[in-house]
């Protein structure tokens, strides 16, 4: 009624009380309404400005998904979506060490819950004021990452049971030449040859093997084109297989994907009609030349059917990883008889052309994405026969810096790919979301220790803010390296009269800091070099050669000991140091490194895992040292150290 009587009257007129006044009083409405409207517009603009600022602040505070570890790496695939989810049941030891009754909080009275909360808070205060996070766990300072979901008891038991069923490479359904290559070349010199945990899980899965209750590994039915002569040529190709290998650093992922790839390569080669016909023609030519040894007729060799068309392509982010993976593949190729080629920025254009387009053919190609993408632009057929594509260090190659180059390569090769394998030691949320949307049927093979630094790596913390360093990290770093060198100099090596050389890696956050720290260490008598993005590829490979070698380095024991020379000319001859950024923290198999110094505290726990993962590889012991200053988060370092001691995954 009131609204109908007033008619269409603005809010300013209603507030002024002149809505029902005489017509003569309407002259005052425009001025009053204009003033109120102006203030209303200012209020709305200020509210919208503050709201936009709040949104921008929230957007700034949100951690990028590429810097956050995923908590659902081992989730089931979309193929299991039609199954009814199983009820998660606690294991038989779930009730041990409980301090609070396992009641449903909703059924308890409010008073009892308040009393229990008060008791817990007072207990935490008596224990030194330890604060808990939102989820009740002790990792509160690591709020830049979200907590990883704990592996269920049933899943952990199942994975460990699978791992215990395999204790030898003889249990894998490998071709004789591939098995011989693994035992006599790739693992030559090892006394106790056993598969690592990721190899026990990944190799059978990539080979298509299943396990019985009390039997050894059995093979599935082979595809129609894997060797059966009765297979119809018009039969549809088998479906593409997609795998994610997620395991801790230094666990042997390279051999885990190389061995099945070699096995599939040799099986396909034995049934390829083009290769069979080519081998027959070559045999006839050799027989003809043997009958006429004096013949001077020289025929041009026929190009191999695999010329410039490899079957296996392996992508890695750096030239160092090209050399590292290439060495393992070459060792297998010597016995398995495969043509492996490596291309990187260290090679000239002529060498790359001779290797890729050689008439002898190519079976396995190991390259960086940028180099392979440039070749594929001018020669698209190079990816036309790829049956196995491996993306190593997938968290880097599918990140923002590489994804624009890596994704087109995957798209070009997808029509012919039989098996797609992605490997990484850390799975950020961005990569997890990408795989869930792009490859929803991908099978995820994860080890129980994913996102955890091995317990065999000890972590020490040096508070640089205290005496005698007084905030000088350069002095603290040099002192730590001198302590390591002098300790090693007190013990003789395997040869009498010689001491072992300690190879140490120092990690910094900024590229400019590498040269500064390296120069300071040189001034203190330490053999140190800087490794960063501006260092040439050849120089990088040269510096990392001694750090990736498994051979022991030793020098004659100096007179008077390692540090027995006069102070004016003190040197530390039994140490070699590389000062590097995260360029050297991804994938490089630094078997000789036992000590890692973190000059700067890493920005994320992902960098913690990769940097400390340079030590203690392949079951060896290692030690990490973190230099903590006043500007660093000491609580984060303390929680990382505690999680390493407990063998827990980082958050």
Curated annotation (Swiss-Prot):
Biased composition (Basic and acidic residues): 72-83, 124-137
Compositionally biased region (Low complexity): 224-233
Compositionally biased residues, Polar residues: 45-56
Catalytic activity: ATP + H2O = ADP + phosphate + H(+)
Motif DEAD box per record, residues: 392-395
Gene Ontology cellular component list: mitochondrion
Highest taxon above the source species: Eukaryota
Binding site for ATP: 247-254
Enzyme class: hydrolase
Subcellular locations according to the entry: Mitochondrion
Keywords recorded for this protein, A-Z: ATP-binding, Helicase, Hydrolase, Mitochondrion, Nucleotide-binding, RNA-binding, Transit peptide
Span of chain positions assigned to the transit peptide in the UniProt entry: 1-61
Molecular function in Gene Ontology: ATP binding; ATP hydrolysis activity; RNA binding; RNA helicase activity
Any Pfam family matching the protein: Helicase_C
SUPFAM superfamilies: P-loop containing nucleoside triphosphate hydrolases (SSF52540)
Enzyme Commission identifier(s): 3.6.4.13
Similarity annotation: Belongs to the DEAD box helicase family. MRH4 subfamily.
Record text about domains: The Q motif is unique to and characteristic of the DEAD box family of RNA helicases and controls ATP binding and hydrolysis.
Job of this protein: ATP-binding RNA helicase involved in mitochondrial RNA metabolism. Required for maintenance of mitochondrial DNA.
Name of the protein in its database record: ATP-dependent RNA helicase MRH4, mitochondrial
Gene of this entry: MRH4
């Amino acid at each position: 009624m009131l609204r109908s009587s007033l008619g269409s009257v603005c809010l300013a007129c209603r507030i002024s009380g002149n809505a029902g006044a005489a017509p003569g009083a309407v002259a005052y409405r425009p001025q009053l309404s204009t003033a109120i409207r102006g203030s209303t517009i200012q209020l709305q603009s200020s509210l919208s400005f503050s709201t936009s600022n709040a949104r921008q602040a929230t957007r700034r505070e949100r951690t990028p998904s590429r810097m956050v570890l995923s908590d659902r790496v081992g989730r089931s695939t979309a193929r299991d979506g039609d199954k009814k989810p199983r009820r998660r049941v606690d294991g038989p030891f779930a009730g041990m060490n409980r301090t609070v009754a396992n009641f449903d909080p909703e059924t308890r009275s409010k008073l009892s819950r308040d009393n229990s909360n008060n008791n817990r808070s007072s207990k935490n205060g008596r224990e030194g004021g330890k604060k808990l996070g939102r989820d009740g766990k002790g990792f509160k300072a690591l709020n830049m990452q979200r907590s990883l979901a704990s592996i269920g008891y049933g899943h952990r038991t199942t994975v460990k049971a699978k791992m215990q069923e395999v204790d030898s490479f003889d249990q894998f359904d490998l071709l004789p030449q591939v098995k011989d290559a693994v035992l006599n070349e790739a693992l030559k010199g090892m006394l106790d040859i056993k598969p690592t945990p990721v190899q026990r899980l990944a190799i059978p899965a990539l080979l298509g093997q299943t396990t019985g209750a009390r039997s050894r590994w059995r093979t599935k039915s082979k595809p129609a084109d894997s060797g059966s002569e009765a297979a119809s040529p018009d039969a549809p190709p088998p479906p593409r297989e997609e795998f994610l290998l997620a395991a801790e650093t230094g666990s042997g992922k390279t051999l885990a994907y190389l061995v099945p790839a070699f096995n599939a390569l040799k099986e396909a080669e034995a049934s390829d009609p083009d290769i069979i016909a080519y081998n027959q023609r070559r045999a006839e030519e050799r027989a003809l030349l043997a009958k006429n040894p004096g013949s001077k007729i020289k025929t041009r060799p026929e190009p191999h059917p695999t010329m410039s068309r490899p079957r296996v392509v392996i992508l890695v982010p750096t030239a160092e990883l090209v050399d590292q993976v290439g060495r393992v593949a070459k060792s297998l190729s010597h016995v398995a008889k495969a043509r492996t080629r490596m291309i990187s920025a260290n090679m000239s254009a002529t060498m790359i052309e001779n290797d890729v387009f050689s008439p002898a053919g190519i079976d396995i190609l190991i390259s960086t994405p940028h180099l392979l993408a440039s070749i594929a632009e001018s020669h698209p057929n190079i990816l036309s026969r790829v049956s196995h594509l491996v993306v190593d260090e997938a968290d880097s190659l599918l990140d923002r810096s590489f994804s624009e180059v890596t994704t087109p390569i995957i798209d070009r090769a997808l029509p012919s790919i039989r098996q797609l394998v992605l490997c990484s030691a850390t799975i950020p949320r961005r990569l997890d979301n990408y795989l869930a949307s792009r490859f929803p049927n991908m099978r995820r093979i994860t080890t129980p220790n994913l996102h955890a630094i091995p317990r065999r790596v000890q972590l020490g913390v040096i508070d640089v803010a205290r005496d005698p360093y007084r905030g000088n990290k350069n002095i603290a770093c040099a002192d730590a390296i001198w302590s390591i060198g002098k300790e090693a100099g007190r013990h003789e090596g395997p040869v009498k009269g010689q001491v072992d050389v300690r190879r140490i890696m120092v990690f910094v956050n900024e590229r400019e800091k590498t040269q500064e720290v390296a120069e300071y260490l040189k001034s203190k008598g330490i053999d140190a070099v800087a490794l960063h993005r501006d260092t040439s590829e050849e120089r990088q490979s040269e510096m990392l050669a001694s750090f990736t070698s498994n051979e022991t380095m030793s020098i004659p024991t100096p007179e008077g000991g390692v540090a027995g020379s006069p102070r004016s000319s003190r040197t530390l001859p039994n140490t070699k140091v590389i000062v590097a950024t995260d360029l050297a923290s991804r994938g490089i198999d630094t078997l000789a490194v036992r000590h890692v110094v973190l000059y700067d505290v890493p920005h994320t726990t992902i960098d913690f895992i990769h940097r400390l993962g340079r030590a203690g590889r392949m079951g060896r012991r290692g030690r990490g040292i973190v230099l903590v200053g006043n500007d660093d988060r000491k609580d984060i370092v303390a929680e990382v150290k505690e999680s390493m001691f407990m063998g827990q995954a980082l958050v």
